[in-house]
From Swiss-Prot:
Allows the formation of correctly charged Gln-tRNA(Gln) through the transamidation of misacylated Glu-tRNA(Gln) in organisms which lack glutaminyl-tRNA synthetase. The reaction takes place in the presence of glutamine and ATP through an activated gamma-phospho-Glu-tRNA(Gln). Belongs to the amidase family. GatA subfamily. The keyword Nucleotide-binding applies. Its EC number is 6.3.5.7. GO terms for biological process: translation. GO terms for molecular function: ATP binding; glutaminyl-tRNA synthase (glutamine-hydrolyzing) activity. This is Glutamyl-tRNA(Gln) amidotransferase subunit A. It catalyses: L-glutamyl-tRNA(Gln) + L-glutamine + ATP + H2O = L-glutaminyl-tRNA(Gln) + L-glutamate + ADP + phosphate + H(+). GO terms for cellular component: glutamyl-tRNA(Gln) amidotransferase complex.
Amino acid sequence: MIRRAPFLILLRFCRMGKMACSGYPPFQGRIVLSEMPAHRLAALIRSKEVSALEVAESFIDNIEASDSRICAFLYTDFSYTRDVARRVDEELKSATKLSPLAGVPIAVKDMILTRDMPTTAGSKILEGWIPPYNATVIERISRARMPILGKTNQDEFGMGSSTEYSAYKTTRNPWDLSRTAGGSGGGSSAAVSASQAPLALGTDTGGSIRLPAHCTGTVGIRPTYGSVSRYGVIALASSFDQVGPCSSNILDAALLHEVIAGYDPADAVSIKDQDLNFSQAAYEGANRGISGVRLGFVNPSNWCNSKITDLFGRTLKSLESEGAVLHEVQFPNFDHAVQAYYLIMQAEASSNLSRYDSIRFGPQEMAASASGTVSKTRSIRFGPEVKRRILLGTHILSAGYYDDFYMSAQKIRLLVKRDFAKIFSLVDVLLLPTAPTPAFKLGEKIDHHTSMYKSDTATTPASLAGLPAGSIPMGVIDGLPVGLQIIAPGQFDSRVYSTGAAIEQIIGDIHAMKNTKHNTGQTA
């Protein structure tokens, strides 16, 4: 028996004309706005059943009540949030045509430039810095009239897998406050998981959207490289960095993806011709189901723990019973991908972070000379993980090691791309567990760097190849959510949404299992 996701049944009925034009039947009982998906909130705002300001206040209340425990946000500006919400309500009164997500609040990762709001990339070297302009994606959500709630916590400059390397605070997992929310963008996914925000923006270099989604039981999408503008996004590794949506369900992610995607001449790798019908793909996937879809998979037993491996196997059997066509595929260079990624990423990061000299922006630690000021500022204000990766990256690019390390990693990158090309000649999408383990205990891996880096084992291959990939909830193990990763060919992001929506229908909503007796830690 398929457990249908309620919101997709609701949307299906709406599309069949069985509901009023407002899209939803009258509510019965208490309305909890902060627990509703973004697409439903948007419909309620458009139909004027609730105001955008009421929706904003609901999430503001949640942030004020819970963020002292979760630590998802680095900065909030609720006056701005309320001002945008009021503007939406006024425009609705005048029958102004608004975007599908108008009035729906959003949180933004601190890697993304926001004019008039601090942007620090989770680092003390940018403490208090307020950018003079918005990133392209911020301009687009502003035009869509989406109120920004604030900036979310992250590992410093995106370097980490647990948000423990933030210079300001450690984000905690809403499922169990003793565990990580993932990284680097743990703040965005934790905010969505804790109902502090219905939507969030993240950035994904080697898995920084997908890994937090896995840890927090949310949806996180890495778009095709070049499909969402990087202009105004603080660079970690320029050949990998992508902005993407974080949400509680596939449809919401698709709607947000449509807002932020599209060509931008300010980004040198921006793709001109794109198919942006992601929400339509989600609708069609939910209606059509998984039958006939060719699902590739790789046996994860040599890199995943046994419980995730078993759950992945059961999930594949469930999908096969619903008509999916399974293919176990060969991925010869899978085991080398994470190593190649870290070599290239650290090399690019050492170059990108050389611009933080304290002269142009950020606070200064004064010394007797200009060079001394630069050296002192970088020594004091960069965190230990950032320093470690800058040193490694500089070493990788140095004479005598460039060919052995950097060029060898680039050769592996090419081989990974070829592996994917062969895989997608046989299947429509590739499925993998998103990570080797459920969310680990805070402090467990912070001094075990190799173990921390291995958290990215399954997410780095898609990053190397520039492919679209998303993590959706696969189930719960010992009270903790785990994710299923869907990877599609380049510029076929719609397959992530259609397949994800179909699988989401079969797996059902895992959030009813939150705060169960299996959860041994304090919960939010």
